[in-house]
Each structure stands twice: as structure tokens, then as C-alpha cells.
Swiss-Prot record:
Source taxonomy: Bacteria, Pseudomonadati, Pseudomonadota, Gammaproteobacteria, Alteromonadales
Protein name (Swiss-Prot/TrEMBL): Electron transport regulator A
Organism: Shewanella oneidensis (strain ATCC 700550 / JCM 31522 / CIP 106686 / LMG 19005 / NCIMB 14063 / MR-1)
Gene name in the database record: etrA
The HTH crp-type domain, residue ranges: 164-237
Family annotation (PANTHER family): CRP FAMILY TRANSCRIPTIONAL REGULATORY PROTEIN, FUMARATE AND NITRATE REDUCTION REGULATORY PROTEIN
GO CC terms of this entry: cytosol
Example GO BP: regulation of DNA-templated transcription
Complexes and interactors: Monomer.
A GO molecular-function annotation: DNA-binding transcription factor activity
Additional comment: Possesses 4 cysteines which may bind a metal ion (possibly iron).
Amino acid sequence: MTIEQNKNRRSAASGCAIHCHDCSMGTLCIPFTLNANELDQLDDIIERKKPIQKGEQIFKSGDPLKSLFAIRSGTIKSYTITEQGDEQITGFHLAGDVIGFDGIHAQSHQSFAQALETSMVCEIPFNILDELSGTMPKLRQQIMRLMSNEIMSDQEMILLLSKKNAEERLAAFISNLANRFGNRGFSAKEFRLTMTRGDIGNYLGLTVETISRLLGRFQKSGLIEVKGKYIIIVDHHELNLLAGNARIAR
């Protein structure tokens, strides 16, 4: 599909009329560093989809790579299915994150992406994005930066699971989530967990019981307050010390 064909298809589609110029997540997403003309060209190929409902899948493992997806709002989890048929969560993605890079090598997705709450995404046709990036060095550089961030987060996750104990893993997860919300202009002190404790345990290699016990311990120690699904950071410094300053990029 050419850029012009996609532009016509996008115009005919029912979407949400927000543009890259107006998006508050632009500094975290693909448009970062582009000038006004380049931003217009990128904006022309993007399709804004209707809200994705909780539990709905954006893509499945084995689906051909057609697009990357920039998250405008909400939370998306990525996961794979093990040989035993069990779900293994590989990441939680927030507004400003771009997902779908896993499909570039084999031209098909290697994981699943599912909404944890009502979410909005921008669909970016990969072939046209690749064509545009050939004429826009800043765009290509930003795509490479985003891919590099994925590699770095995978490396940090391996380190977290192999070298950290249960307390350190959960502390790193909460601290990182707080920082990510803060980077997006939200409160880094108080936020809602859109993922279940089972999801968190799956991601960190811990049981649900361990997650619940540690949350209670953190609360008694004055690190956090837990109010249902809401987390309030009471002592960010001590939480970071417990985490060992593990970052986990995504």
C-alpha cells in the first residue's frame, strides 16, 4: 500500500481526530525530534482506532507484521505462551510506548498484545513507516532508539530475575512504574495498578501469595500505602534503595 492509498483509507475510516501535533505523548513516541513538515507526513499515514476494550487483543503470535502500535492511553500487556500452554508476561506498556517491534525480524509477531483496560492506540503501517524513515534520518534514529530501549529493558529484566530476591524484584517494579507514570505527566506518587497481582507475579516470577505478602510488608515498613488497586509511594528513596536502583525500561 502506498502512502497516498493509506491516506485515502485513513480518511474513510472512523477514527478519533487527534493528531501527532496535539498528542501529549509525542516526546516519548515516534514523532519525537521531527519538524512540522515531517510530523505532517507521519501523521498522514497513522490510523487512529476506536477504543480497544479490556481483554481485547491488538495482535496475536503468528500474525503477519502489518503495523506498529503507539499507545495513546491505557495499558497493554505483552505475553507469550510456553510449550506447556502457560502464559508468560513479557511486559506492561503505557501511553507513549510503541509495541510490535517483535515482528520485524520474521515479519510476523512473536507475542500477544492485550488491553488491560480500555485503551487507545495509533496504528502505524510498518512498510510505509519504513519507506518514510528512508527519507527522514530523525525518524529512523527515533525508531532505532525505541528498539534499543526494548533491548535494554529485556537485558535489565534478565538481570532482575537472575540476581534479585523477591523483595527487590517487587520494589524495582513499583519504583519503575512510578517513574514511568511521572515521565508521562501523571502522578509518580499515587497510581492505579491496571494489572492483577497474578499478572505482576507472573511477570516477576513470583506467586500471587508472595506479591500480596510483600505489599503488606512494604506497607508496614512505611514504603507504600495500598488502597485496593491504588499504590501510594510514601518513601521513594527507601523503595529505590530496596530495589537496588534496578530500572526496567518498560
